[in-house]
Structures are given as C-alpha cells and as structure tokens.
Amino acid sequence: MSITPYLLYEDVAGALKFLSKAFGLKKSGQTMKGADGKLNHAAMQLGDDLIMMGYPGKKYKNPKRLGQSTQSLYINVDDVDKHFARAKKAGAKILEQPQDTFYGHRRYGAEDPEGHQWYFAQEIAKSQKA
C-alpha cells in the first residue's frame, strides 16, 4: 500500500522544473496537455515515492490562489543538510532551518513558488516508545 499526493499547480511545467532543481524530484510517467497546449498533468518521483500534479481549473484552488496552505508533505531523505543546501540555492522559500526534533529526525521546511509546504527529514535516532 502507498499514498500518492496530488498537488495543484497553476504552472505545471514550471513546477516540474522547480521541484527537480530544488528538491531533486524526477519526472516520471506520462504527462498530459490541455486544450490550450499547456501541461496540465504530470508525475514526479523521489526515490520510491510518487507525487502527481495537475492544473486546478475552476473547481479547485491551490495554496497560491487560496492564499494559505492546507497541507504539507513530509519526505525522508538520506542527507537532510545536503538537501537543504540544494533547496536554498535553487530559491525555495525556507520555512524552517534544519533542526533536530524530539522524535529523532533532523528536518527542514520549505515552500515552493505556488505555496505548497514541503518538509524533508532524516532519521538521526530511533524514537523511544512512550
């Protein structure tokens, strides 16, 4: 079983470029263009994780259009500090600097140009059961 988030982007082609450059995601699978010729569906992968994206149309709103974020993604990576440096260099808006958490992860938070919040983490210690 797995979960595949579906994120909404006004500029799907721009999201593909940014997410690749900043977060290391790779284009995966088929893309689809709308009647206007613009890309309106794509999928990307980070390791074994798949993330799909599409144009929101009139029925839905992405964080940019809504004016706030309603969810975030939490993704485990091998080297969170190296990942942070890449995201920062690529122009991601940094929400949280890398920090160690009480639950045994080192993580940072970033926001993409359309307002989606991404948290990347690395396990640094096994968490203790309560």
Residue ranges and their predicted role:
Residues E114:
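C-terminal catalytic core of tyrosine-transesterase DNA break-rejoin enzymes
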Residues M1-L8, L16-K17, F23-D78, K82-E111, ...:
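Vicinal oxygen chelate
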